[in-house]
């Protein structure tokens, strides 16, 4: 990925500077251990790491070159992984408590590391790179990328067929709301409109649907959009290649015909109806209904998270703060062991794929 530092030697051979060392430790264990009796096993190192951070910070925490303690656990089964994970978690708690640091443990996305679970240790800091949510009611805490939107099924009234209305010079949500209220006597706000954000994902067009009062958080989108290597917003050249997409007046109702994959915020529930683009210049449509007039290909957490949003556990309002990541722990599962052929013989003499964890300060 883009975080890797790549280089070549004088003979043209390709190398990279290690950002982390899951693969190397997996291969090392593969060459040294072969039985369930050798596990559980944890190995650590303290070594310089290199990452081409998009926004390197001054100081010692988030630079492109930094010293990191990384450790790796190896277990026969998931129950063993859970034990190893919790031991490392408690060791980190003991370490940070002994140092007197203020920190929060938050749910996080595993990202390119893979795996089923990860948590970050975040030290609150107004200039920190990470943003997280915290519920003072139940203690729920999560990186904004991992924040879950909890919504109820739509209970509103059914509406009639789509109506296409003249809305000249309304390419923005604010201008659209103004015209609807003044020209058509409506009583709407931005939350009643549907925003269609067009992007190119690995050079294929996609649309992300969010309520009109929200923005798409590209960092959240990238974290939750699995398997996509390159993501960028639509540019004028992309509209030129897709002439049926009218800039400022795009709606989801023709997405399938246009070859667009539809991703939607969980708030775009089945049966909800919206005011959105009519796919015609200077025209918008109302009563565009999810499930009837368009089908969502995949729901995704991509809308911006705000202070005051409901906690997914207790539904009380959350607060938002910034922080510096000082530790990150992962349950990697069998991703690396499967890829690199790390197995051990179990009690019956049968080979089983080892399950792994990764832990870094």
What are these regions (language model features)?
Residues 1-53, 199-200, 267-271, 335:
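Active-site loop/lid in soluble adenylation, ligation, and acyl-transfer enzymes
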Residues 22-29, 55-71, 76-361:
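Extended, low-hydrophobicity, polar/charged segments
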